[in-house]
């Protein structure tokens, strides 16, 4: 039975993923036509390569339409409800590092923790007659972190369609949940990360669809990639 491995379709993630596979002895033969999103692996007739966006990879793993994929853990946890039941993290690949964080305006000087934010949320309701607005593309992770982990219920998620970090300055939100690598963009927008506001430390991972793990070939490919990382 053939194995389908989904890889990021462009940019540095694609380059770094191909380097990881090469180190594991899987030389990917790229198609001549850049519009062709399928590739093959030299000497591996039963291993199919499919190029997708990182978010598509997370979704297709959840559907079980691909067996293995390389994508960010943040996308896996955000895209898939009950992700632990649907996919498994086979290996952390050591690149694509970024944190999903809770960030508030720097002028909120007395707000440094999630406990402080709980007080702010209640104060917003009492003083302004509305809920605290949080701009984010990570609504699932935000709800889990705020409501389930910290018991904060009085807030409203504002869907972010553009640059999330600009939402507070634009007046469309009071604070944000976003992904950051260095924090420089947050600082440029006069935002600060709460002391206990790191929701997830993410990086690129090799991920398997749970039901695909019954295929011994899937396990073999994942094991070989892990061993390549150790080399």
Swiss-Prot record:
InterPro entries: ATP_PRibTrfase_cat, ATP_PRibTrfase_CS, ATP_PRibTrfase_HisG, ATP_PRibTrfase_HisG_short
Reaction catalysed by this enzyme: 1-(5-phospho-beta-D-ribosyl)-ATP + diphosphate = 5-phospho-alpha-D-ribose 1-diphosphate + ATP
One Gene Ontology MF term: ATP binding
Keywords: Amino-acid biosynthesis, ATP-binding, Cytoplasm, Glycosyltransferase, Histidine biosynthesis, Nucleotide-binding, Transferase
UniProt keyword annotation of Cytoplasm present: yes
Recorded metabolic or biological pathway in which this protein acts: Amino-acid biosynthesis; L-histidine biosynthesis; L-histidine from 5-phospho-alpha-D-ribose 1-diphosphate: step 1/9
One BP annotation, GO: L-histidine biosynthetic process
Broad EC category: transferase
UniProt keyword Nucleus, yes or no: no
EC number: 2.4.2.17
Record-level GO cellular component terms: cytoplasm
Compartments it resides in: Cytoplasm
Entry superkingdom: Bacteria
Pfam families assigned to the protein according to its UniProt record, in alphabetical order: HisG
Chief location of this protein within or outside the cell: cytoplasm
HAMAP family found in the cross-reference section: HisG_Short (MF_01018)
NCBIfam families given in the database record: hisG (TIGR00070)
Functional description taken from the UniProt entry: Catalyzes the condensation of ATP and 5-phosphoribose 1-diphosphate to form N'-(5'-phosphoribosyl)-ATP (PR-ATP). Has a crucial role in the pathway because the rate of histidine biosynthesis seems to be controlled primarily by regulation of HisG enzymatic activity.
Record text about domains: Lacks the C-terminal regulatory region which is replaced by HisZ.
Subunit structure: Heteromultimer composed of HisG and HisZ subunits.
PANTHER family: ATP PHOSPHORIBOSYLTRANSFERASE (PTHR21403:SF8), ATP PHOSPHORIBOSYLTRANSFERASE ATP-PRTASE (PTHR21403)
Family named by the database record: Belongs to the ATP phosphoribosyltransferase family. Short subfamily.
Protein name: ATP phosphoribosyltransferase
Organism from which the protein derives: Brucella anthropi (strain ATCC 49188 / DSM 6882 / CCUG 24695 / JCM 21032 / LMG 3331 / NBRC 15819 / NCTC 12168 / Alc 37) (Ochrobactrum anthropi)
Gene assigned in the entry: hisG
């Amino acid at each position: 039975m053939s194995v389908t491995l989904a890889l990021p379709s462009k940019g540095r993630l694609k380059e770094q993923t191909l380097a990881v596979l090469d180190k594991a002895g899987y030389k990917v033969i790229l198609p001549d036509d850049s519009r062709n999103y399928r590739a093959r692996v030299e000497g591996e007739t039963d291993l199919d390569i499919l190029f997708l966006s990182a978010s598509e990879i997370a979704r297709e793993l959840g559907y079980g339409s691909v067996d293995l994929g390389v994508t960010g853990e943040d996308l896996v946890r955000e895209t898939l409800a009950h992700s632990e039941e649907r996919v498994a993290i086979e290996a952390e690949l050591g690149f694509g590092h970024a944190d999903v964080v809770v960030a508030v305006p720097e002028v909120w000087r007395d707000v440094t923790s999630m406990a402080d934010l709980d007080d702010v949320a209640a104060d917003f309701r009492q003083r302004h007659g509305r809920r605290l607005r949080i701009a984010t593309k990570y609504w699932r992770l935000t709800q889990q972190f705020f409501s389930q982990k910290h018991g904060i219920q009085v807030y409203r998620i504002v869907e972010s369609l553009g640059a999330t970090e600009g939402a507070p300055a634009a007046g469309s939100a009071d604070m944000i949940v976003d992904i950051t690598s260095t924090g420089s963009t947050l600082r440029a927008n006069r935002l600060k990360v709460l002391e206990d506001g790191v929701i997830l430390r993410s990086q690129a991972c090799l991920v398997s669809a749970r039901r695909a793990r019954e295929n011994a070939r899937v396990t073999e490919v994942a094991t070989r990639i892990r061993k390549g990382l150790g080399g």
